[in-house]
Amino acid sequence: GLAYDISDDQQDITRMGINPIMMSAGELESGNAGEPAKMCCLFINDLDAGAGRIGVCTGIFR
């Protein structure tokens, strides 16, 4: 299998002024069925591959 190192992404996110909090999906589950879910944010890695068309700089984010 492939190993993924998220440390570079965490550094980039921190530079943008965002404080990432890593957690497992199990931490979002409730022990009581029917209890409202907790709020979360989805981080999509490699977003520039699909949304990287910015003028003449296609796919380049630095």
Curated annotation (Swiss-Prot):
GO terms for cellular component: chloroplast stroma; thylakoid. Disulfide bonds: none annotated. Its main location: plastid. It comes from Vitis sp. It is found in: Plastid, Chloroplast stroma. The keyword Secreted does not apply. InterPro entries: RCA-like. The lineage of its organism: Eukaryota, Viridiplantae, Streptophyta, Embryophyta, Tracheophyta. Keywords: ATP-binding, Chloroplast, Nucleotide-binding, Plastid. PANTHER family: PTHR32429, RIBULOSE BISPHOSPHATE CARBOXYLASE_OXYGENASE ACTIVASE, CHLOROPLASTIC. Activation of RuBisCO (ribulose-1,5-bisphosphate carboxylase/oxygenase; EC 4.1.1.39) involves the ATP-dependent carboxylation of the epsilon-amino group of lysine leading to a carbamate structure. The keyword DNA-binding does not apply. This is Ribulose bisphosphate carboxylase/oxygenase activase, chloroplastic. Belongs to the RuBisCO activase family.
